[in-house]
Amino acid sequence: QWERHWTVNVMAGVRLSRAYLPAMADRGWGRAIFISSESAFNIPAEMIHYGVSKTADVALARGLAKRMAGTGVTVNSVLPGPTLSAGMAAMLKPVQEKTGKPIETVAADFVTKHRPSSIIRRASTVEEVANMVVYIASPLASATTGGALRVDGGVVDSLA
């Protein structure tokens, strides 16, 4: 799984950046957005390979942001925490069927058990993560670059 995660989570970003950043720089405007994970800073013991690849993803974005300095191109990472996506809903479906609880409640129970540092004590919604992406893709975020922007519900216990 190490090689697969490295290829998907890191090398895909390298390849896409090589393909698109030069043209963005030539135009004097662009946005590169990496979807990372709170696992980049909160590496799960059961998924070290995933956490390491997401940490590399954040480092890649930061380095590319420095490389793009002065071009009008920003590069950022978005770090979702537990998110009630279709994938999470599918993973939790057996529990939902067994308990009869709404999927949001099952997801909140999962977050409470597996990510007890969560401040919001529930899974984020896909829309909440998308809102961050929309913002950093917009002209409003022209001074936001090289960032690791968390949409993690406070899961990562850090002041930075």
Specify the residue positions occupied by each region the protein language model found:
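Catalytic Tyr-X3-Lys loop
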Residues: 1-14, 33, 57, 120
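A conserved structural motif in NAD(P)-dependent oxidoreductases
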Residues: 117-129
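Residue(s) in the substrate-gating loop at a strand-loop-helix junction
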Residues: 37
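Short C-terminal tail/terminal secondary-structure segment
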Residues: 42, 133-134, 140, 145-160
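Short, small/polar-rich loop/turn modules that mediate ligand/substrate recognition or access, typified
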Residues: 69, 74, 144-146
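Active-site helix of classical SDR
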Residues: 17, 53, 61
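Active-site loop-to-helix junction immediately N-terminal to the catalytic Tyr of the SDR YXXXK motif
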Residues: 43-51, 63
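Alpha-helical segment proximal to the catalytic Tyr-Lys
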Residues: 22, 66-67, 142
